[in-house]
Each structure stands twice: as C-alpha cells, then as structure tokens.
Amino acid sequence: MFKNEITNLQNHFLVAMPTLQDPLFKKSVVYICEHNDTGAMGIVINKPVEKYTVETILKNLKITSTQRDPSVQLNHPVFSGGPLLNDRGFILHTPQTGFGSSINISSQTMITTSKDILETLGTPNQPKNILVALGYSGWTKGQLEQELIESTWIAVPADETILFHTPIFNRWNAAAKIIGVNMYNMNSQTGHA
C-alpha cells in the first residue's frame, strides 16, 4: 500500500505481517475504531487475557443484576486490546443505544467505554454480540501510515463474523483471507531483500 493510497481505515482490520515479532502484536488482528488526521485507535481482537472472562470482570467490579439470564454465557474471554490504558475497559458490540459513552464505528459495530454496558451483560438488555477488551492500541499522526508503508501490517475491510464469531486462534489468518492472503503460506522474511 503506497502512501497516496492510504485513506481512512476506521472499520478495518490491521493484520500483523509475519515479520512483526513484537510480542504485543505478533500475529495480531487490530480492529480500527478511529482513524483521522491526528492518529488511530484500535482494539486487538485475538489476544485473550489468560484466565480472565467477562464473568471475572463482573465479579471483580461487584456488578450483579436481578435480570441475569442464566442461559446467557459470561465465560467469554477478555482481550488485551493493546498496551495503552490497559486497566480500562473497551467493549465492541453490535449497535444498541442507551449507554453513557458510545461511538458508532460502522452500521454493524459500536464501541462503549461506560460502565453502564457492563450492567447489561448476561441480561436480556445485553447487545447481541460483544467483545470485551482491556486497553487499546494507538498510533500518533502518520505513525500507522508509516507502518503500512513498511509492510508491518496489511489493512483489510472489517468483517463482523470475524470480529464476533470466528474462533480466536483463526482470526489472524481469516482476516488476511478477506483479501486472498494465506498468512500460513508467508515466510517471516517476506519483504526483505
């Protein structure tokens, strides 16, 4: 991707190239929530926090509801969204209004950072699909564009199925396959002369 081709990547996945060896981002898929002339913000969607679930968060925050539906599973993993503000929650979900701090990312996805959404989890008021993350990934002005030029990432249009339903260990390759790339066939030295 050349510099003059880079446009707004909101509602795209960044798929780490095999050459990216930083343990925070190796084989990661980042969902871009915001991208503008001041930088970019995204959530890693395939790096779960070990032994940490949505249920764990609700218990730790002492959030209970009398409307809790026992048939709704709360054992979903919590993801390490990135190295920034990793003590703060970010919830990607299918559109649903009524929360204190939500932003529409696309017609299929919103992000909410207010605690009131946590009170709906496991109840009939919960958004249809959710992905809970601690922390986020951020890029300053021009930083993401430079990383794309350097082939650190490939950018692909986001897919709600991958975001919410694809098994975690398949997301890296599944996201790349959106544009016909099989990451398992790529060498970690790709792009080096």
Swiss-Prot record:
GO terms for cellular component: cytosol. Pfam families: DUF179. InterPro entries: AlgH-like. It comes from the Bacteria. Belongs to the UPF0301 (AlgH) family. PANTHER family: UNCHARACTERIZED PROTEIN YQGE (PTHR30327), UPF0301 PROTEIN YQGE (PTHR30327:SF1). This is UPF0301 protein Bfl251. The lineage of its organism: Bacteria, Pseudomonadati, Pseudomonadota, Gammaproteobacteria, Enterobacterales.
